[in-house]
């Protein structure tokens, strides 16, 4: 097998590495740099990538930066002239450039790659990344999470006992925290959390806003309306941010930034580290919530963490390092280069795939729960978040009405108990179900998440063997804001969600009890005295009335009343059957009055009835 390169496809910068012997090595670009700006420019019909594209961004409006922030957004396009490009196409141009100079370095064609993504990337974003690789002519052997890759780079040569490692990964546009267990060549992810819209770009923007406000107050001119001025400000802000990682104050000088009535205007200002920390403190504090959540989901406290690894260029910011040190109660490990660790780890995984690296097992997790909508609009989870992947889970569901010929499988991703509060990943239909009473057909729904975190769902009618499958497409994924909203709302609305769930459960129980009671009344007709049957009929009508009036308190009261008299009826029927069969062996035990005739694990499905005549 040919070399498998490892690519860190970053928001602001990308890197590539390859395994040489037993060691991963960064491949430098044609300019000799170890990282490449994730910038694409269109100029005179030519596509420029990397440093050359970044250098002329001030004068060329057809320059695209930070495209990674839009991966997985089906409606996002970049217009250049009369053509519109998807984020996958722009990302593919960066990957093509990396592929080319990697081939020049290796002296052989490169076809296979491992590409990294933020741990909190959803299914749509992962699919989009894989698609970008395909467009670039790469066979993407594996998609792995960035914190996991950096842990691979950190732990490759470690011979110590088991370690619990927390990876704090703050890049140019995304943020992740992962907790891993390392030992005996096994890299097991225990939990992951993050914010796919937080990174170094946001720190730059804080400086830009400060410069714009200051210039406006002093000169009465709003630089934010001048595209060329804003590009100069962005370059200056990025440089100032980097300078302040090493010095306590930096001077920002932008001559001829604008012009007023008196002539040219210049921007000259000093930015201290203290002021920068003040401007960006809210961004640093935003990383605390995922930090805490990752520990909580792993079932650990800070005292259980043996090492803290910083990854991503933005972790060079002193305030970030100090915050992590304070939260973790220990000095972060600085043994790996935060700009290069992810690519090095991806190259190690490439070596595992090619067979050059032995005795390493990578066990990653899925960041969000997956399931389907069931009766009453409930979100029934099949795979919980932070489940080790690859994984597969099946559950039996059934029909909601008699003689239902088809079921609609509504696939969802999120953490809320009600389907409407989660994100639709896709829908598909299983048809030609033979006519049968509700609850009888056995529909097996299977979720499968592959090693790349990409989701496949199938539904199979166990009676006929007919099966329908769907691979969730990138257009149906979640946005980063939606992921954060799901997690936040799941905590804020826990009480409200519990009440909704309780109401739906009650309605489902009432519906099921009415159905079962009517079935029982047909079975006992003529077998018991009317005086035994009438109380059940009366209680049944009372419950139906409460159901029709939508009175929840009445429904609960009448449900309990019907359950009691129905149980009494079942006892009398059992006693009569016993008397009729005295002396006969092999008497069967009583049936579960709540059974619907299907598997005990069967869950009523919220499926759409399909008219076969249409």
Swiss-Prot record:
GO terms for molecular function: ATP binding; ATP-dependent protein folding chaperone; unfolded protein binding. InterPro entries: ATPase_NBD, Chaperone_DnaK, Heat_shock_70_CS, HSP70_C_sf, HSP70_peptide-bd_sf, Hsp_70_fam. PANTHER family: HEAT SHOCK PROTEIN 70KDA. Induction: By stress conditions e.g. heat shock. Disulfide bonds: none annotated. This is Chaperone protein DnaK. Transmembrane segments: none annotated. The modification Phosphothreonine is found at residue 174. Belongs to the heat shock protein 70 family. Residues 573-614 are annotated as: Disordered. SUPFAM superfamilies: Actin-like ATPase domain, Heat shock protein 70kD (HSP70), C-terminal subdomain, Heat shock protein 70kD (HSP70), peptide-binding domain. HAMAP family: DnaK. Gene3D superfamilies: 1.20.1270.10, 3.30.420.40, Actin, Chain A, domain 4, Substrate Binding Domain Of DNAk, Chain A, domain 1. Keywords: ATP-binding, Chaperone, Nucleotide-binding, Phosphoprotein, Stress response. CDD domains: ASKHA_NBD_HSP70_DnaK-like (cd10234). It comes from Lactobacillus delbrueckii subsp. bulgaricus (strain ATCC 11842 / DSM 20081 / BCRC 10696 / JCM 1002 / NBRC 13953 / NCIMB 11778 / NCTC 12712 / WDCM 00102 / Lb 14). It comes from the Bacteria. NCBIfam families: PRK00290.1, prok_dnaK. Acts as a chaperone.
């Amino acid at each position: 097998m040919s070399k498998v390169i490892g690519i860190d496809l970053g928001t602001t910068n990308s890197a590539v590495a390859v395994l040489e012997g037993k060691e991963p090595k960064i491949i430098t670009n044609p300019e000799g740099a170890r990282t490449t700006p994730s910038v694409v420019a269109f100029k005179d019909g030519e596509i420029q990538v990397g440093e050359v594209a970044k250098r002329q961004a001030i004068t060329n409006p057809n320059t695209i930066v930070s495209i990674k922030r839009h991966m997985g957004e089906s409606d996002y396009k970049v217009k250049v002239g009369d053509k519109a490009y998807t984020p996958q196409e722009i990302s593919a141009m960066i990957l093509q450039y990396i592929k080319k100079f990697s081939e020049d370095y290796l002296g052989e064609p490169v076809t296979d790659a491992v590409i990294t993504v933020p741990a909190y990337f959803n299914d749509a974003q992962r699919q989009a990344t894989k698609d970008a690789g395909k467009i670039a002519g790469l066979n993407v052997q594996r998609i792995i999470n960035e914190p996991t890759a950096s842990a691979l780079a950190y732990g490759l040569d470690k011979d110590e006992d088991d370690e619990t490692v927390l990876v704090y990964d703050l890049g140019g546009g995304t943020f992740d925290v992962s907790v891993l267990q390392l030992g005996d060549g096994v890299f097991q992810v225990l939990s992951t959390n993050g914010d796919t819209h937080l990174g170094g770009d946001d720190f730059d923007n804080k400086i830009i806003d400060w410069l714009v406000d200051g210039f406006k107050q002093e000169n009465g001119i709003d630089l934010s309306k001048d595209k060329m001025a804003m590009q100069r400000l962005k370059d200056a802000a990025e440089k100032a941010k980097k300078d302040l990682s090493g010095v306590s104050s930096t001077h920002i000088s932008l001559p001829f930034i604008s012009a007023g009535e008196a002539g040219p205007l210049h921007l000259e200002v000093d930015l201290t580290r203290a002021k920068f920390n003040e401007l960006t403190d809210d961004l640093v504090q935003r990383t605390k919530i995922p930090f805490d959540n990752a520990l909580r989901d792993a079932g650990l406290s800070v005292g259980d963490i043996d090492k803290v690894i910083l990854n991503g260029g933005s972790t060079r910011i002193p305030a970030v390092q100090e915050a992590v040190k304070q939260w973790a109660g220990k000095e972060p490990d600085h043994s790996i280069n935060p700009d290069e660790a992810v690519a090095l780890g991806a190259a190690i995984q490439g070596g595992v795939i090619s067979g050059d690296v032995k005795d390493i097992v990578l066990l990653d997790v899925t960041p969000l729960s997956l399931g389907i909508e069931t009766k009453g609009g409930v979100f029934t989870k099949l795979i919980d978040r932070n489940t080790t992947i690859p994984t597969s889970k099946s559950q039996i569901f059934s029909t909601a009405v008699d003689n239902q010929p088809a079921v609609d499988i509504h696939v969802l991703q999120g953490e809320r108990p009600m389907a409407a509060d989660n994100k639709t990943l896709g829908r598909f239909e299983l048809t030609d179900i033979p006519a049968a009473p509700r609850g009888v057909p056995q529909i097996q729904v299977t979720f499968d998440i592959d090693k790349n975190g990409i989701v496949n769902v199938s539904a199979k009618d166990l009676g006929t063997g007919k099966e329908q499958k769907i691979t969730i497409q990138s257009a149906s994924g979640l946005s980063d804001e939606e992921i954060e909203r799901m997690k936040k709302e799941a905590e804020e609305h826990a009480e409200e969600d519990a009440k909704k769930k309780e109401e739906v459960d009650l309605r489902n129980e009432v519906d099921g009890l009415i159905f079962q009671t009517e079935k029982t009344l047909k079975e006992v007709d003529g077998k018991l005295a009317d005086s035994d049957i009438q109380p059940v009929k009366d209680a049944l009508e009372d419950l139906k009335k409460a159901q029709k009036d939508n009175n929840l308190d009445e429904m609960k009261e009448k449900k309990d009343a019907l359950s009691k008299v129905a149980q009494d009826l079942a006892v009398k029927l059992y006693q009569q059957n016993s008397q009729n069969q005295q002396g006969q062996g092999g008497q069967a035990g009583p049936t579960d009055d709540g059974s619907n005739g299907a598997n005990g694990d069967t869950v009523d499905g919220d499926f759409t009835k399909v008219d076969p005549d249409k």
